Amino acid sequence: MARVKRGVTTRARHKKVIKLAKGYRGRSKNCYRIALQRVEKALQYAYRDRRNRKRFFRSLWIMRINAAARQHGLLYSDFIHGLSLANITLNRKVLADMAVNNQDNFKQIVDITKEALTKSRVAQ
């Protein structure tokens, strides 16, 4: 049976890890064993934070919508409830963008939701 030399695959694997560790400080950028640990930890952080980013942005959108709705005399929960009553299906990302960049359009939506809320309260 022929002898298998694994220098090529080892070098390729090491190069891949060292390439991922580019920009790290100290021996973390050029010592394979240390770089491997740092890269594995970095990939764990990246995996975790891809999920955390979704939570963070949703909460940011909610804060922006809440602040803009309160400027027009409406609580966030009432505003969202009024949107569902008025059959407005804009998501929070779009609403937050409107609250920051298109305040006139956001004001019109707030007026529509206020109207829908008063109609539902009168009906009860």
From Swiss-Prot:
GO biological-process terms attached to the record: ribosomal large subunit assembly; translation
Biological role: Binds directly to 23S ribosomal RNA and is necessary for the in vitro assembly process of the 50S ribosomal subunit. It is not involved in the protein synthesizing functions of that subunit.
GO CC terms: ribonucleoprotein complex; ribosome
Superkingdom of origin organism: Bacteria
Pfam family name, one: Ribosomal_L20
Keyword rRNA-binding set for record: yes
Entry's family note: Belongs to the bacterial ribosomal protein bL20 family.
Family matches, as SUPFAM superfamilies: Ribosomal protein L20 (SSF74731)
Alphabetized UniProt keyword annotations: Ribonucleoprotein, Ribosomal protein, RNA-binding, rRNA-binding
An MF annotation (GO) of this entry: structural constituent of ribosome
Protein name from the UniProt record: Large ribosomal subunit protein bL20
PANTHER family: 39S RIBOSOMAL PROTEIN L20
NCBIfam families: rplT_bact (TIGR01032)
Record-annotated membrane-spanning stretches: none
